[in-house]
């Protein structure tokens, strides 16, 4: 069976707590229907669902791509002086290529919770420079550092941020993420993202930042946001998404949306083919304790 020419690489399941409304089993069934050879899971700040997602995808013959949309502190992860919650962290999508990448993602998230927690579990560029091997990075949504600066009209800052990420993730491991999601701001930012891509020779990739399975699930997701923020659907001026297009679009829909920049579609397949992590389950991996000269483990106990 010929597979589709597009794969979703930015997607939030129910493990994006009170934000994602996609159940892994339903996602995998839809990926099969769309003939996708692979699909990613990139929940906010955690990989709580990694084992569940991996097992269910493998059982149905779909390649699971483990990932995470991490929060990146604008400065140091130890800094607690950012003026507001909205400026406390940028978004960055990390996808696991191999065993080393999975180990590094686990280490990054552990550090984020233990050392960088401020509203959200945050990493910083110091950690990314140290623990990037085996990971592919995508520039994320409008809350990504590059997109955020473009939205403010600060093109120089956007170029600087993109150049930093390209240096941190060399060998074609950093991609500029483009989305067509019905948001006017996104369309404006896309133009700037393409400029950044061409100026710095950074490849682009198409995503949809999926938060729910089908378009009609947008209202259910809106109720989930109300629970998250302690509001009701009738609360004025509450937080809500200004689009109903953050669903798992078909390959045909994505190809049509990006017909003017087809490499953004083909690059999803390239990335999927480069991600080949095999999760070894049912094995015991005990920690190694260094033993001083002249000692044994028994003598130390």
Indicate residue ranges for each PLM-predicted region.
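Phosphodiester-processing cores and adjacent nucleic acid-binding clamps
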Residues: 1-301
